Amino acid sequence: MLKPMYYEFFFIFPKEQELFESFLLDTTHLALEESSLESLKAFDDKETIEFISQSSWHYFATHDPLKENLKEKPPHLKNFVILRSQKDLNDSLIPALKAFCLSLQQNLQSGFDFFYLSRNLASKDWLEAYKQAILPVQCAKFYIHPSWHQKPSHVATDDSIMIDPALAFGSGHHESTSICLELLSNLDLKRKNALDVGCGSGILSIALKKQGVSALSACDTDSLAVEETLKNFSLNQITLLAQDKVIHGSTQKIEGRFDIIVANIVADVIKSLYSEFVRLCNHTLILSGILETHLNSVLQIYYNGFEVLEQRQRNEWVALKLLKKQSIN
């Protein structure tokens, strides 16, 4: 009797990883796992370490089409994205990723590339294996954990955030989310009104509510993100009050002014939303999801309307805490 099989895909995206992760999510509706050699070593997964370290990776580059389908080693084999499927997606997903690369090149006027590996394995409880790989993480004052890990008794309820990272929406493990939470943790938000732009999993909105904001608005252009935010509100026993709103759409649907705005989104969207943030922000604006290579272009746009109070960086990811200049209405 043949054993049931499943397929495991490994991806390395040298540029705009979050854009590629969102594409994978929208295309496959499957869980993604951000992993690294360090995490595989922690779980003593010698088989997978050997596979990704010794295999020749497939490579695709929009700026060097002659290299298409050549096999080579990624220059930085450290962090990667894992996708698991009960179906072989090589003939559908990989061509779709290549087409996505080409569309990014056309829209952003820059070259894009990615590395990938795949293998098929005898079926096992890989969902359970995935769960075991997702560990709690401490982000400043917040202890972030999935529902299958219990909160330690010494951690206060207001400092605990429960997120099941089944979708690529933000679980506290990504650098851009963690440094954004660090900047939020230092603020006195009691009786303030707040806006979370690109709410994703709702992790930043939950942090805002736990820090005492009196009114919260959150928005995302992805309907799945809105559903995920509402689900995680319920998971964390966050009650939406009459003045709280979770909206499917962008900032154009938001009215009023906010004491604090947070946006953990890609740099190109941050740049396009400058005038909207000027319209909506009364005081503090926290921006994250900015790759170091895009930082100067973001600062050039925001210089006229905002003062940089603090800048934090982890690996290639940067977050900014900005103060709106009083001369700007």
Curated annotation (Swiss-Prot):
> Could you say which EC number(s) this protein's record lists?
2.1.1.-
Cellular component aspect of the GO annotation:
cytoplasm
Q: Which residues form a coiled coil?
A: none
| Reactions performed catalytically | L-lysyl-[protein] + 3 S-adenosyl-L-methionine = N(6),N(6),N(6)-trimethyl-L-lysyl-[protein] + 3 S-adenosyl-L-homocysteine + 3 H(+)
Q: Does the keyword S-adenosyl-L-methionine apply?
A: yes
- Molecular functions (GO terms): protein-lysine N-methyltransferase activity
Gene Ontology biological process terms from the UniProt entry = methylation
At the top of the EC hierarchy, this enzyme's class is transferase
Which residues are involved in binding S-adenosyl-L-methionine?
A: T177, G198, D220, N264
Query: What InterPro entries would the database entry show?
Result: Ribosomal_L11_MeTrfase_PrmA (IPR050078), Ribosomal_PrmA_MeTrfase (IPR004498), SAM-dependent_MTases_sf (IPR029063)
What does the UniProt keyword field contain? Cytoplasm, Methyltransferase, S-adenosyl-L-methionine, Transferase
One of this protein's Pfam families, by short name?
PrmA
* Principal subcellular localization: cytoplasm
Q: What role does it play? A: Methylates ribosomal protein L11.
**Family that this chain belongs to:** Belongs to the methyltransferase superfamily. PrmA family.
Q: What is this protein called?
A: Ribosomal protein L11 methyltransferase
Could you tell me which species this protein originates from?
Helicobacter pylori (strain Shi470)
